[in-house]
């Protein structure tokens, strides 16, 4: 079992025969550079994904902020999974007639400058599931909140630090699902080469602290992120 993309990459480099189950991997097709990815990796790799539905994330932006005309896509250019997410969300928003612009940082050193540029441009910021963003939520919040610019986020950890709302994946449930997949392989019930990547349901959640600071009334159907 390999937790996250780096561990999955290392495991795949070490063996082509032993079954490898990845977990907390956002986009397998991107991580494995599969142009024809159809939901099943094949070979000795399968697993679970922490990706929440991207079209639903785009819908969240228009549901929470129906007057928004410009959305800044704030992400790390060095993370292929992040780039995949923002491209998909940008397409969904374009179909809604909303203008988007990418603000990509390369590492933690330019998070603040890119966030400031995003805040100057946008009505709303979108942050995908992104490792660098997750490590810099305080810096991001310190710019967006005073500027009065809300953020919709790809996962709960980022949202709890700097966002208004998210579709939250339970990493506990993701681990349980991965464990069940492992059991099927070990008992001979399933062949990893034909096992599709599995997902877990996402829960709409909001950040009560940032909503209060920005004067935003939470929408019905969203759970508060606990302190």
Locate predicted features:
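Hinge/cleft segment of the Venus flytrap/periplasmic-binding protein
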Residues: 184-227
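An alpha-beta-alpha
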Residues: 46-94, 194-211
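Periplasmic-binding protein-like
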Residues: 145-165, 203
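Pocket-lining segment of extracytoplasmic ligand-binding domains
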Residues: 80-149, 155
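Beta-alpha junction/loop-to-helix N-cap segments that form part of ligand/metal-binding clefts
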Residues: 1-35, 130-154
């Amino acid at each position: 079992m390999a937790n996250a993309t780096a561990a999955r990459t290392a495991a795949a480099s070490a063996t082509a025969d032993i079954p490898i189950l990845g977990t907390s991997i956002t986009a397998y097709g991107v991580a494995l550079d599969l142009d024809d990815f159809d939901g099943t990796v094949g070979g000795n790799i399968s697993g679970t994904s922490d990706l929440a539905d991207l079209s639903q994330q785009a819908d969240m932006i228009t549901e929470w902020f129906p007057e928004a005309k410009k959305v800044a896509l704030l992400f790390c250019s060095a993370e292929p999974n992040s780039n995949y997410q923002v491209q998909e969300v940008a397409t969904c928003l374009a179909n809604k007639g909303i203008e988007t612009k990418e603000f990509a940082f390369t590492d933690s050193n330019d998070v603040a400058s890119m966030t400031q540029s995003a805040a100057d441009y946008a009505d709303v910021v979108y942050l995908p599931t992104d490792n660098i963003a997750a490590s810099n939520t305080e810096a991001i919040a310190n710019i967006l909140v005073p500027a009065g610019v809300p953020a919709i986020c790809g996962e709960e950890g980022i949202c709890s630090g700097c966002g208004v709302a998210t579709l939250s994946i339970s990493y506990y449930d993701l681990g349980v699902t991965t464990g069940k997949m492992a059991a099927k392989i070990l008992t001979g019930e399933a062949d990893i080469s034909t096992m599709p990547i599995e997902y877990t349901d996402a829960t709409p959640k909001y950040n009560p602290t940032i909503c209060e600071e920005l004067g935003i009334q939470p929408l019905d159907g969203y759970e508060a992120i606990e302190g």
